[in-house]
Design a protein with these regions (language model features):
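Catalytic cores of alpha/beta
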Residues: 63-78, 122-127, 137-154
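Glycine/Thr-rich beta-alpha phosphate-binding loop at enzyme active sites
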Residues: 26-38, 68-127, 167
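Active-site beta->alpha loop and helix N-cap motifs at the rims of alpha/beta catalytic domains
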Residues: 1-23, 28
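Glycine-rich phosphate-binding active-site loops on the catalytic face of alpha/beta enzymes
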Residues: 26-28, 83-90, 141-170
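Structural preference for beta-strand elements that scaffold enzyme active sites
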Residues: 21-23, 54-58, 81-85, 130-132, ...
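Short beta-strand/loop segments at the ligand-binding rim of alpha/beta enzyme cores
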Residues: 51-63, 121-133
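Active-site glycine- and acidic-residue-rich loops that bind
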Residues: 1-9, 35-37, 56-77
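Acidic (Asp/Glu)-rich catalytic clusters
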Residues: 12-18, 47-51, 74-79
Length: 177
C-alpha cells in the first residue's frame, strides 16, 4: 500500500522534531487493507523512510506464529526499528453476537492470546529490542504476567477507560516494586 507509506513519510517529516518516537500501528481491523501491511516487505520500506527516532511496530494478535516469527526476525535484525507492540484488537476472538459488526475485540478476552504472543516475541527478540505488551491487561496481576513473559513495557487502554487513572497508578506502582 504505497499510500500508507507516503502517509507515514509525511507523519515522520511533520513530527520528527516534536516527538521522541513513533508507534506504527499496522494492525487495526478498522482500517481497510491496513493489516495487509504486516509484512517483511512493508517493514523494509518503512526502514527506508524512517527518521532517527524510536520506532515500534504494532501487530495484530491474529497473525500465525509463522507470520509473527518472520516479522520479529526482521525487527530483531533492523538497525532502525526499536521494537514492537503486541497486540492490537482481534477479529477472531469476537463474540458471536458481534460477528457481523465492524472493528475488533479488545479487553479481557484478548489477554491469553496477547500473553502468548508476548512470550513468543520475548524468545525471538532475546532482549535486543523493546517489547511493549498490550491486550486484556485489566489488573495488576495481568500486568505482572506480561512482564514475566518478557515485556519491557505494559500498555493499557480498555481498563483505563473503565477503571480510570487510578488503575494506571496502581499498576505502575506494582510494576515498580
Amino acid at each position: 500500500n504505497e499510500s500508507a507509506l507516503k502517509d507515514y513519510q509525511q507523519l515522520f517529516k511533520e513530527l520528527e522534531n516534536e516527538v521522541d518516537g513513533f508507534v506504527i500501528n499496522i494492525s487495526s481491523p478498522n482500517t481497510e487493507g491496513l493489516r495487509d501491511l504486516q509484512s517483511v516487505e512493508f517493514l523494509e520500506k518503512l526502514e527506508a523512510i524512517a527518521p532517527s527516532k524510536a520506532i515500534w511496530v504494532k501487530f495484530a494478535p491474529d497473525l500465525s506464529q509463522e507470520a509473527l516469527t518472520e516479522l520479529l526476525e526482521k525487527i530483531r535484525s533492523s538497525s532502525k526499528l526499536t521494537g514492537c507492540v503486541l497486540t492490537n484488537t482481534s477479529r477472531k476472538i469476537a463474540l458471536e453476537q458481534y460477528q457481523r459488526m465492524e472493528g475488533g475485540y479488545s479487553g479481557t478476552k484478548l489477554f491469553e492470546t496477547s500473553l502468548e504472543r508476548v512470550g513468543w516475541a520475548a524468545e525471538m527478540l532475546k532482549g535486543e529490542k523493546t517489547l511493549v505488551a498490550i491486550g486484556g491487561v485489566d489488573s495488576t496481576e495481568r500486568a505482572l504476567k506480561m512482564r514475566r513473559a518478557g515485556a519491557d513495557l505494559v500498555e493499557v487502554y480498555t481498563a483505563f477507560v473503565y477503571q480510570g487513572a487510578k488503575f494506571v497508578k496502581t499498576v505502575a506502582s506494582a510494576l515498580a516494586d
